């Protein structure tokens, strides 16, 4: 495999995001009908576990537009992965940044688009040292 075909440390898909029109109804459907494990909810978003891949349900944007599905790829080091992709011509719309402090880790994201304008995010869950 030559250097041009390396995947820059992209891991498994860590999360897929889809738009829903009624969050409570969708939570009930995915949890009660499909049997997915409900993880947590924040304003306008709900998260489920689907065999180790997180499913994010989100309400449409404030302007009423649905967002396209989003692929989130796990990476060990988000800055190194972003730097490697930038060297390949990727222009990041959102630079690596911590977006959530969860119970045991900090969630970092960085986003760009594919040629069809689909959103792709790098995600890194950085453990916090316990005190």
Predicted feature residues:
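Alpha-helical segments within the soluble intracellular
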Residues: 31-32, 49, 86
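N-terminal beta-strand motif that seeds the catalytic metal site of vicinal oxygen chelate
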Residues: 1-24, 54, 69-71, 126-131
